[in-house]
């Protein structure tokens, strides 16, 4: 990975910093300790291209409902390439606790800044929206909230409770941050309102954490997944990584082994795509045959489900990923 650690190198000067404003692109990545050096972009192979269709009526209906209830989706904030398909099918991944993250991960397109106070009406608005959309399966995720004493776990729990009250048959997957320095408290809180699927992404190989996930720790994230599983052995745990950031195939396989060693049941692997020229460069486009190899190895390792492919994202077809896993969670194999 081409990274600049020389403070004397010729990088653009940082604009005036206003922590209350949401920073995206260069305004966000210019302040990380290890600078991203622009590289010539690799041409996209045919298999990586998304088939763009005309937005459906359902697409606009969901957007209107989200805006009316002051809700945010990670689909929009992270510039997910699958947004048209998912919205068109009536599914969305809800992002709670605002749209400003306290971290500056240079692979991610979610904005950075000083988060706003929690919206006390958000759990109710979220639950009403899910009920109005008649969703059978929902994914709730969030920005990192290092400013909160519980890392936002209490807000997650309240959202789960309200959704269950209004939509008792809806299955709930949560995609959580690492609750850095607050794991004990967060697990204590989530223990009172556990989800149907617990998801926390490792994102990449540990060798690349300093560049790709500043402020995060690989072993800490694995421990979060293992400790949750110990508290809820019948609740599936899930994690995902991106490929194309500079990892090797062996590193991908080792991350998968580490997941299984920490009792992770479900896996997602997808191709990293640059949100903009200010983000980490794509170092390789992984061939479909290699994705197939990852998938085959995943099932050999004992994963209950593996969603693996170029356009796979953590929440993409999450309902299909979880189908049959949640129902048979108590019979899942564990190493």
Curated annotation (Swiss-Prot):
Record-annotated Radical SAM core domain positions: 86-304
Recorded metabolic or biological pathway in which this protein acts: Protein modification; protein lipoylation via endogenous pathway; protein N(6)-(lipoyl)lysine from octanoyl-[acyl-carrier-protein]: step 2/2
Location of this chain's protein in the cell: Cytoplasm
InterPro entries hit by this protein: Aldolase_TIM (IPR013785), Elp3/MiaA/NifB-like_rSAM (IPR006638), Lipoyl_synth (IPR003698), rSAM (IPR007197)
Entry cofactors: [4Fe-4S] cluster
Reactions catalysed according to its record: [[Fe-S] cluster scaffold protein carrying a second [4Fe-4S](2+) cluster] + N(6)-octanoyl-L-lysyl-[protein] + 2 oxidized [2Fe-2S]-[ferredoxin] + 2 S-adenosyl-L-methionine + 4 H(+) = [[Fe-S] cluster scaffold protein] + N(6)-[(R)-dihydrolipoyl]-L-lysyl-[protein] + 4 Fe(3+) + 2 hydrogen sulfide + 2 5'-deoxyadenosine + 2 L-methionine + 2 reduced [2Fe-2S]-[ferredoxin]
Enzyme Commission identifier(s): 2.8.1.8
GO CC terms in record: cytoplasm
Pfam families: Radical_SAM
Region (Disordered): 1-29
Any one GO molecular function term: 4 iron, 4 sulfur cluster binding
Keyword Glycoprotein: no
Binding site for [4Fe-4S] cluster 1: 75, 80, 86, 315
PROSITE patterns linked to this entry: RADICAL_SAM
Domain of life: Bacteria
Binding-site positions, [4Fe-4S] cluster 2: 101, 105, 108
Record's cofactor remark: Binds 2 [4Fe-4S] clusters per subunit. One cluster is coordinated with 3 cysteines and an exchangeable S-adenosyl-L-methionine.
Biased composition regions of type Polar residues, renumbered to the chain: 1-13
Keywords for this protein: 4Fe-4S, Cytoplasm, Iron, Iron-sulfur, Metal-binding, S-adenosyl-L-methionine, Transferase
Protein family: Belongs to the radical SAM superfamily. Lipoyl synthase family.
Protein name, as recorded: Lipoyl synthase
Natural source organism: Herminiimonas arsenicoxydans
Name of the gene encoding the protein in the UniProt record: lipA
């Amino acid at each position: 990975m081409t990274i600049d650690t020389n403070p004397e190198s010729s990088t653009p000067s940082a604009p005036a910093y206003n922590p209350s404003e949401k920073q995206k692109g260069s305004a966000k990545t210019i302040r990380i300790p290890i600078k991203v050096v622009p590289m010539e972009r690799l041409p996209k192979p045919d298999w990586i291209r998304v088939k763009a269709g005309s937005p459906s009526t359902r697409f606009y209906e969901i957007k209107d409902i989200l805006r009316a209830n002051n809700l945010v989706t990670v689909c929009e904030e992270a510039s997910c390439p699958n947004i048209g398909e998912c919205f068109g099918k009536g599914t969305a991944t809800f992002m709670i606790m605002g749209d400003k993250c306290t971290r500056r991960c240079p692979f991610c397109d979610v904005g950075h800044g000083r988060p706003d106070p929690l919206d006390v009406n958000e759990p109710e608005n979220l639950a009403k929206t899910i009920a109005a959309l008649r969703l059978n399966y929902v994914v709730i995720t969030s920005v990192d909230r290092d400013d909160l004493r519980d890392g936002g776990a209490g807000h997650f729990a309240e959202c789960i409770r309200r959704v269950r009250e209004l939509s008792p048959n809806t299955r709930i997957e949560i995609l959580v941050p690492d609750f850095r320095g607050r794991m004990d408290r967060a697990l204590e809180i989530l223990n009172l309102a556990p989800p149907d699927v617990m998801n926390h992404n490792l994102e990449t190989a540990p060798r690349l954490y300093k560049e790709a996930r500043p402020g995060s720790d690989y072993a800490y994230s694995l421990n979060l997944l293992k400790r949750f599983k110990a508290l809820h052995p019948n609740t599936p745990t899930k994690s995902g990584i991106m490929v194309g950031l500079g990892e090797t195939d062996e590193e991908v396989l080792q991350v998968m082994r580490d997941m299984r060693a920490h009792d992770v049941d479900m896996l997602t692997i997808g191709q990293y795509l640059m949100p903009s020229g200010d983000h980490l460069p794509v170092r390789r486009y992984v061939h479909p045959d290699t994705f197939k190899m990852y998938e085959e190895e995943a099932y050999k390792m004992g994963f209950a489900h593996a969603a693996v492919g170029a356009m796979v994202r953590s929440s993409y077809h999450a309902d299909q990923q979880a189908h049959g896993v949640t129902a048979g969670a108590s019979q899942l194999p564990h190493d």
